[in-house]
Amino acid sequence: MLLVNLAIFIAFLLLLAQLYRKTEKLGQTVFIGLLLGLLFGAVLQSAFEKPLLDKTLDWINVVSNGYVRLLQMIVMPLVFVSILSAIARINQTRSLGKVSVGVLSTLLITTAISAAIGIAMVHLFDVSAAGLIVGDRELAAQGKVLDKAGQVSNLTVPAMLVSFIPKNPFADLTGANPTSIISVVIFSALLGVAALSLGKEDQALGERIAQGVETLNKLVMRLVRFVIRLTPYGVFALMIKMAATSKWADIVNLGNFIVASYAAIALMFVVHGILLFFVKVNPVDYYKKVLPTLSFAFTSRSSAATIPLNIETQTAKLGNNNVIANFAATFGATIGQNGCGGIYPAMLAVMVAPMVGIDPFSFSYILTLIFVVAISSFGIAGVGGGATFAAIVVLSTLGLPLELIGLLISIEPIIDMGRTALNVNGAMVAGTITDRLLNK
């Protein structure tokens, strides 16, 4: 049966390839791949025992994990070359300050809004930490959470800011540190400023540098486009894995929390659309253009791996400035994450508060929580780890117990898909808003 399963998988891949060749519509093919993957994965889980299912997924993961690794491969070269190239072409370095402020302020404001929405959804759906099942998996997860809490306890804002400054740019280009992406952004920006300075002193030298950087940029972008064409197949394989490994009993047991989480995520997508409308961007057209990128973010559960798609979508489809697109995509992958850094920790903080005698819906607690969530979403870039670290930072800051994080481990992948898509959309929205405001 293994060979039959793989034959069907390959047949679906060929079908997607034929469809893409005929239509040349990447977004449409990605969406079809997502639906086919969901269907095929559900059939695999219901029809086969775990040993055969695991063997089938091992081969399917060659496509899914291979695609994710290809995207991870091009993240650092893309960020480095794109920002260096874009800055080398601009005339005023002070524009960098405006771009940084615009992107970061939009990310933090939308994170605060997402926290408020998360709080409201807990109240609306009456979600509580009481009665959650504690099994062996949950106990093991709680132990890991407490271990990670030790990494957060010594993290201060000054230490976090210092960690952004590149110490060894070559090590950062390998992604060796949690802050490597931001460090590469800073290094490439400084190198771009140095190129501008040389160009002012020696115009001929400046032109040669600009031509060399532009050639390198075109080479990297051609590689990016090669990888992006593989998106339908990567999304298809990733969706199979998700559907085939989801535990439906856990989904039923924690259904209320899942529904509340996705209601908050959906509402935040609406808020993003409203914000875009205010800067004269049609939300419907916007979401049509970004759907392939959101589909990949949803299935891969990786904001960092989505950076190449994010930048390509912003520049090629949304018309955003290259510098703004790079800053928004890279900062948005680590700072001001609307889903992992906003909605999720806010919901947990409200659910846990009654256990220690705090009224989670008092005005003072809500204001404090939103402020802590917004600031903490900036700080988690210093440690990495997404939603888990964000929740640890927020709960620790408020003096709340951390055990709830481990109790939700069984549904973490299901919720994380929606959170990651929202993170990526928040980054693209920040880039689009900043671009429209600075280029009026």
Curated annotation (Swiss-Prot):
Keyword annotations of the record: Cell membrane, Membrane, Transmembrane, Transmembrane helix, Transport
Membrane topology: Multi-pass membrane protein
Annotated localization: Cell membrane
Xref: PANTHER family: L-CYSTINE TRANSPORTER TCYP (PTHR42865:SF5), PROTON/GLUTAMATE-ASPARTATE SYMPORTER (PTHR42865)
Pfam family, one: SDF
Gene Ontology CC terms: plasma membrane
Source organism, top-level taxon: Bacteria
Descriptive protein name: Uncharacterized symporter HI_1154
InterPro entries: Na-dicarboxylate_symporter (IPR001991), Na:dicarbo_symporter_sf (IPR036458)
Family note: Belongs to the dicarboxylate/amino acid:cation symporter (DAACS) (TC 2.A.23) family.
Molecular function (Gene Ontology), one example: L-cystine transmembrane transporter activity
Transmembrane segments: 1-21, 29-49, 70-90, 101-121, 179-199, 226-246, 258-278, 343-363, 366-386, 389-409
Cleaved signal peptide residues: none
